[in-house]
A protein has these predicted regions:
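N- and C-terminal low-complexity/disordered segments
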Residues: 2-138
């Protein structure tokens, strides 16, 4: 009986660390915000919604998965900034240049990033989950 329990424990621990498994990450880690900023810049390049650019406010959740490279999946609170689309190009957006617009629209987005650093490859897939009311805490 003891041998079976030891083997099951070993199998469970081994399976948790296998390639391809989804791992929850610390959403507050600075590396995630950097990746999210790059994704939101792409979101702004492909969108004409509103007069101002969107900026990330908070990484709500972060997950990773080892595939042919790394796949990162984020839920991100995004909000309207004070940076006008006509005055600031999407690739020039930064937290130093753009701050939150008072009363601006907020939304929750899913940002997926597939990276293969050895090939200098990064591909973003971005989708809006829902709008977020100003009074709603996330």
């Amino acid at each position: 009986m003891r041998l079976v329990l030891v083997l099951l424990s070993t199998f469970t621990v081994t399976m948790a660390g296998l390639a391809g498994g989804i791992t929850t990450q610390d959403a507050s880690a600075p590396e995630h915000l950097e990746k999210v900023w790059r994704g939101v810049k792409q979101l702004n390049q492909g969108s004409n919604d509103g007069a101002n650019h969107l900026i990330p406010v908070k990484v709500v959740s972060a997950k990773s998965q080892v595939v042919a490279g790394a796949k990162w999946t984020y839920e991100v609170l995004v909000a309207e900034s004070n940076c006008s689309r006509g005055e600031v190009a999407p690739h020039d957006l930064s937290k130093e240049k753009c701050t939150l617009k008072d009363g601006g629209n907020r939304s929750l987005y899913k940002i997926e990033l597939w990276e293969k650093p050895w090939e200098n490859f990064a591909e973003y897939t971005i989708s809006k989950i829902r709008s977020v009311e100003a009074s709603e805490q996330i």
